[in-house]
């Protein structure tokens, strides 16, 4: 007899797992701090996964899935939790991935993020981007930053999300969260109307195309704080990705716009903790200092990493600098730090210097 959806999700939550994978021909599997492992000894059949999909989706979502073979949504079971769901076709079968969403919004301090995140989120205007691969914790970091703003400053925060993951409460700010496909048709429609809602802060769940990027730049230029995410691995790749949205002849203008409005690019990866208790965020921080703005305006993104390495006094850091700090504090192992490093050889040398007492990066 196949396990119930409730049974599997409860098991994932109890294990503090991140993702539940439901695929035909294999057992229900969870990704957690110990890696990926099956949780129930039952090989899923077509009818099992189809039944789970039918339970998760409403009539409208089923219609969209029938037309596109894709559906992304939020799903909640009382007493168990809230989940981000992706339902898709693979080799002619339905597949489901369910990611656990923490309904209690974490704080910047609880996530162990640098204190400069609190300063950045409280600036009055500009563009802040949080980047990283899928599953790197971008949404969690943004939620913590928004909660800090919500807790400390009055104003109006509007979010456009696909789907809503963390549910915020009104605190010092009024916060309105709009879900794509439920509260507005798509990002473009929501963004075309957002200024009518008199926001101080606009959160765009993800920038996927030129039109969304244009709105982000324009609203940052007109005095709003704009927050969003991109699927890019670091600051250099993020800047290159943004320019690739647009025709080549527009690049100089895009570089000038970015130099004017960009306030920070935060890139992150999740690395297993040395004590096997879970994963820790490793963050690269690029702050739009005068030197960075000059490089961005000229399109000289290749020099930005060196500038970050030399600007720790401004709150900047590279991935490898943060990995070195975490290794020094015993939070990540040498093996995992080197696996996540941008420059394995350089980080290894710095670690050897650190372990022999040589001065290193703070």
Locate the predicted segments by residue.
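Short, flexible helix-loop junctions that flank or precede catalytic/ligand sites
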Residues: 1-362
């Amino acid at each position: 007899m196949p396990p119930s959806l409730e049974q599997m999700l409860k098991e994932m939550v109890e294990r503090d797992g991140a993702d539940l994978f439901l695929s035909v021909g294999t057992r229900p599997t969870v990704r957690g701090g110990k890696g990926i492992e099956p949780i129930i000894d039952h090989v899923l059949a077509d009818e099992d996964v189809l039944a789970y999909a039918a339970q998760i989706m409403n009539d409208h979502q089923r219609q969209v899935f029938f037309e596109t073979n894709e559906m992304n949504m939020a799903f909640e079971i009382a007493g168990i939790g809230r989940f981000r769901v992706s339902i898709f076709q693979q080799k002619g079968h339905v597949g489901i991935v369910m990611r656990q969403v923490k309904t209690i919004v974490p704080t910047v301090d609880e996530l162990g993020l640098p204190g400069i995140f609190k300063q950045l989120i409280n600036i009055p205007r500009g563009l802040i981007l949080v980047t990283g691969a899928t599953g790197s914790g971008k949404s969690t970091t943004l939620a913590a930053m928004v909660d800090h703003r919500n807790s400390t400053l009055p104003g109006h925060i509007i979010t456009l999300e696909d789907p809503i993951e963390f549910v915020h409460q009104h605190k010092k700010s009024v916060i309105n969260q709009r879900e794509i496909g439920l509260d507005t048709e798509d990002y473009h429609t929501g963004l075309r109307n957002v200024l009518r809602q008199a926001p101080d802060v606009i959160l765009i769940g993800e920038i996927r195309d030129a039109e969304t990027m244009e709105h982000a730049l324009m609203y940052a230029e007109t005095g709003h704080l704009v927050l969003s995410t991109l699927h890019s691995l670091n600051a250099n790749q993020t800047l290159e990705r943004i320019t690739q949205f647009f025709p080549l002849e527009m690049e100089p203008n895009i570089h000038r716009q970015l130099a004017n409005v960009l306030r920070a690019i935060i890139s992150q990866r999740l690395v297993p903790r040395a004590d096997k208790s879970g994963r820790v965020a490793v963050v690269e921080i690029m702050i739009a200092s005068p030197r960075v703005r000059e490089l961005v305006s000229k399109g000289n993104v290749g020099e930005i990493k060196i500038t970050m390495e030399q600007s720790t006094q401004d709150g900047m850091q590279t991935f490898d600098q943060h990995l070195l700090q975490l290794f020094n504090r015993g939070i990540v192992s040498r093996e995992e730090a080197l696996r996540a490093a941008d420059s394995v050889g350089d980080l290894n040398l710095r670690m050897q210097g650190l372990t022999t007492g040589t001065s290193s990066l703070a």
